[in-house]
Amino acid sequence: MAQVIDPHSWGVVEPLIPVGGRYLELGAGTGSIAKRAADKVGAAGLAVATDINTKHIQPHEFLNVVTHDLQTDPISDLDPELWNAIRARCLFAHLGKRDTLVAPLADALKPGGHLVIEDWGATGGGFVLRSPYKRTEVLFQQYQAALMAYLRSAGNDGTWIQRAHKLMVEAGLEVTTFTSAKSWNGRSPGCKLPISMSIQIEEHLVEHGMGRDDIYELRDHLNDPDVVLMGNLTWSFVGRKPVEG
């Protein structure tokens, strides 16, 4: 995933992180963006990366790694001071209390600070732009349908992206929302991602209606450079806390 959306994500958040500032990343995954943020704030600042399982977060001399569950642990437990930037990517749609978590994050910002929430959802799924095979489009549609069905069964809310902007405004933030996507040829990161995902959750895809042979056939197609996918839309919600006066 990092290879697919890190360039976009870093382009969004990097201008919002001041040198020597305070940066908090929630659900940091491997910490690929958090490490860049740590470089930006430097020794004079503070960069914190959290997750419920931090074993995949790569170490960095200026990055503090903390085990933290956003649904149960107050943000103030991480540090009582306010933050210049707080970021979460592909996290909120998975959380059961997602709608109630925005306001506390807005409250944890310094005046002029930013909350960045990025996610994928049920709107803006990827699709096949070109393929030398007749079945690629149908197979990819089957994959997307089975994937979304599995995610729903696991508690993921694909409609979250339709509420995020409104919830951030209601939390007192000045919000700008935009999307980003690009095309990917077979064997490139954007095609390797569904291949990897289909391997990780193969049994779940089968349980939700995709034939095993169809999964294998789709993987073969996505390894062909002549196949071109349009990637999922990445939704970026950027909220700024107003400066009083």
Placement of each model-derived feature along the sequence:
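Conserved alpha-helix/loop element of class I SAM-dependent methyltransferases that forms part
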Residues: 3-21, 36
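A short glycine-rich, Lys/Arg-flanked "PGG" loop and its adjoining helix->strand segment in the class I
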Residues: 99-114
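A short acidic, Gly/Pro-enriched loop at the edge of an enzyme's catalytic core
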Residues: 75-86
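Conserved catalytic/acceptor-binding region of the Class I
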Residues: 116-188
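Helix-to-beta-strand junctions that scaffold the AdoMet/dcAdoMet cofactor pocket
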Residues: 18, 42, 95-96, 109-111
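Conserved Class I S-adenosyl-L-methionine
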Residues: 157-162, 174-245
